[in-house]
């Protein structure tokens, strides 16, 4: 039906070999790439044409994770607004993507949403069962990411999400944190543990 048509000025032809789940050189499907840039219309078109919305990258990232903010966008790649990304997250979730799946790094969709600074996505994920204290392989929780564990490299810190996550039940004692994010009492305890 939509194949060979026009979607906002883009030609929408079926792949020549009919494989709607073909992996690109980075190990990602067209559906996952559409989720990554929050293109809900393309995501829906691909599903309508038979794409499998449950396929992950070879690193284990799901389309829901990509839409939420897991992974690094290429220079010039537009991840969409937080509102558009929320719609992509909702569609991936409605199509069966699990909010608590983690990739090979232990990152979940919630880690990505916090890194992205998207409180709307954070709330949606938590409302649908995401683990607020999930720890990735580096020992980082969503709260530690909001506090700025990436800050030295990305200058990415979200104080408003720190408050939001704690209000929604995040445990401040879970996950690794930067020394400068610790209270004076916590710094003293850490120093005593090292001695």
Predicted regions and their residues:
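Terminal, low-structured helical/coil segments at or just beyond the last alpha-helical repeat
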Residues: 157-195
